[in-house]
């Protein structure tokens, strides 16, 4: 699916991107378009708001084992380990760029009063979501004239989710526990 869609994905995403899920979302949108869908709900939001990403769970597990600085989170979400970054960047380049860790910490400074995992959730909701995750469904849907709606990002729902204590968001190593538990009321548990 990559070779036949790469030009379309690059054109509609408006930038080169290393995220393979653009292609998967485009394929999903093609199937929806073929079936006459013009407006579709997506599931964007709960991973960011309810700290449902695997790296969030790893962060929480590490927090329970040791005092884990947020710099470690930054290094986990980077695509390249710091040792490799150091090998690729020459001295002149390094002198003229913003230190990514300093920049990351300046973003998080707005949420210094929150627990580290809640700082990460705030960052992912305000930076990662709009800068990456929401772009995928929006632009790949638009490529086929499909309007995507994100009901979990309604400010009323987001505000409720944000008030839920972290201990209730991840239970028994199940991410988005409350959402999944609530959803089971509507679906067969054997699905």
Q: Which functions belong to the PLM regions below?
A:
Residues 1-120, 139-186:
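ATP-dependent adenylate-handling active sites, centered on carboxylate activation for C-N bond formation
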Residues 125-139, 161:
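Short Ser/Thr-interspersed hydrophobic loop/turn segments at strand-loop and sheet-helix junctions
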Residues 187-191:
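Short, surface-exposed acidic
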């Amino acid at each position: 699916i990559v070779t036949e869609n790469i030009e379309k994905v690059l054109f509609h995403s408006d930038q080169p991107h290393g995220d393979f899920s653009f292609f998967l979302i485009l394929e999903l949108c093609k199937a929806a378009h073929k079936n006459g869908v013009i407006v579709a709900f997506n599931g964007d939001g709960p991973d960011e708001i309810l700290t449902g990403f695997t790296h969030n769970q790893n962060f929480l597990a590490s927090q329970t084992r040791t005092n884990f600085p947020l710099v470690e989170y930054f290094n986990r979400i980077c695509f390249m380990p710091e040792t490799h970054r150091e090998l690729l960047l020459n001295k002149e380049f390094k002198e003229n760029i913003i230190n990514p860790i300093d920049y990351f910490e300046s973003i998080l400074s707005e949420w210094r009063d929150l627990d580290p995992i809640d700082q990460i959730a705030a960052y992912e909701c305000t930076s990662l979501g709009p800068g990456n995750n929401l772009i995928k469904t929006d632009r790949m849907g638009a490529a086929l004239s499909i309007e995507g709606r994100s009901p979990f990002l309604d400010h009323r729902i987001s505000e409720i989710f944000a008030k839920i204590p972290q201990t209730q968001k991840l239970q028994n190593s199940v991410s988005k526990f409350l959402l999944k538990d609530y959803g089971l009321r509507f679906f067969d548990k054997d699905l």
